[in-house]
Amino acid sequence: MTFVEFFTKATTTPNEPQGRQPYPYQTVFAEGDSLPELLNVPTGVGKTATAILGWLYRRREATPKIKSITPRRLVYCLPMRTLVEQTRDCAQEWLANLELSETVGVHVLMGGADASNWDEHPEREAILIGTQDMLLSRALNRGYGMSRYRWPMHFGLLNNDCLWVMDETQLMGVGLITTAQLQGLRSKLATYGVTHSLWMSATLDTSPIRTVDH
């Protein structure tokens, strides 16, 4: 299946029975030999679809070479709860259209809605969508709102074999700098499986992601 066919099927709705066509930059993301670090595009042209459907295509339909450089887990980090809910709804709808709901899990990590069982099957592909406090605290081995005895599990799973996507970075504050430093340390110290970070915004300022190790 080509990415155009994949994207069209995923975006089919009652109002758009033929689905939508991807923009050229979305196709480049899905089919490219490497993943970008920055995505700076205007509001309303599909950043969320680029990250989720692009990652999903690379894992499920692309060549073995592309799959091998695409992390097993997609970690979608957002600054606000409402954005988490919107992104979750989109991901679930796209997976249902693609008939992948049973094979790729969507798990939400935010206050009051912590997905407590997402770590039970680390071998499976998964989409983790959460607020930056929940996700970054776990990546720092200080998991907010969870037993400290489970901190190392989430620390390991969120720092290995993951594609971290930071969306609406202009709203993240110091969390943005933390994401960059974490990626710098992963690159410096090495990880199990490919671990990559992507920063996305319509008003992307790259200065905060230049840190001591990144």
Whereabouts are the PLM-identified features?
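N-terminal helicase ATP-binding lobe
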Residues: 1-214
